[in-house]
Amino acid sequence: MLISQRPTLTEEVIADNRSKFVIEPLEPGFGYTLGNSLRRTLLSSIPGAAVTSIRIDGVLHEFTTVPGVKEDVTDIILNLKGLVVSSEEDEPVTMYVRKQGPGAVTAGDIVPPAGVTVNNPDLHIATLNDKGKLEIELVVERGRGYVPAVQNKASGAEIGRIPVDSIYSPVLKVTYKVEATRVEQRTDFDRLVLDVETKNSITARDALASAGKTLVELFGLARELNVEAEGIEIGPSPAEADHIASFGLPIEDLDLTVRSYNCLKREGVHTVGELVGRTESDLLDIRNFGQKSIDEVKVKLHSLGLALKDSPASFDPTTVAGYDAATGTWSDTDAGSFGDAEGTEDYAETEQL
């Protein structure tokens, strides 16, 4: 956390479907960041259930009437859009309304299957006269947000199947405000007040918990960038990091013999990174730098997990004369290491004279 005091969340229940939540303290500016994210998620991304299509007995399309029914089909569909249902099923389910007049048809007349609940049974659907009769088949599905009727139209639907606009979101209204709050001696921290009103299919508390879970899952993608996102390797691995660090080492740290060190310095090679950028041919072009010196450099670089630009990956230091497998080091009995003796700068291997 950015501050030492962990934010707290409290709930004030205003009604069965409405609560006010307070989150504090938050770093300055985070009240709006969190409030806007939660509000947008609550209004658009909370899963719910809704009617996606209907079929009315004796009706072929929505621009008609039903004998004995006061409302036309369009009005009936508009009324059904206000139906609040909850479903535990992932697959579409079917509900039925069968009513004989006279009287009103309400959502309480709907017969839902197991796992489906009608949460506003008082919703008015239609009005029947003495001869009125209404039979409706309703398909209910789960989803998120709002889906227009044109998208609910199935390609192989039977004649008389009427698609309906689906309002899946169980959240009716969300408002928030940010106030100042005090933490120790500072008074510029944020206090987020979130007012959530839902339909009867879910409580405000459950809606906020669902929104928080959705945001955590999405923000988790960014959090994984600190380790490794799927399909993307972010930053060097530990081994690569060691190699990168080794490139900046001065060649003095390689503990080369005096002749090898002096030859490289005269050539302008000062770091390990500059050395690994050379090939064996490049080094042989250096005056007084012979094969023995190249073998020494290759062994020293191998101890760091590095190699010359053209060195084969299969290089085996044990094949080099002077290599001690027990200690993993190379020594030249004919010449001391850098700093062991004076006056050796002009020492040269005979094959390079």
UniProtKB/Swiss-Prot annotation:
Residues 342-353 have a biased composition (Acidic residues). Its EC number is 2.7.7.6. It catalyses: RNA(n) + a ribonucleoside 5'-triphosphate = RNA(n+1) + diphosphate. It comes from the Bacteria. Keywords: DNA-directed RNA polymerase, Nucleotidyltransferase, Transcription, Transferase. The keyword Cell division does not apply. Residues 1-226 are annotated as: Alpha N-terminal domain (alpha-NTD). The N-terminal domain is essential for RNAP assembly and basal transcription, whereas the C-terminal domain is involved in interaction with transcriptional regulators and with upstream promoter elements. DNA-dependent RNA polymerase catalyzes the transcription of DNA into RNA using the four ribonucleoside triphosphates as substrates. This is DNA-directed RNA polymerase subunit alpha.
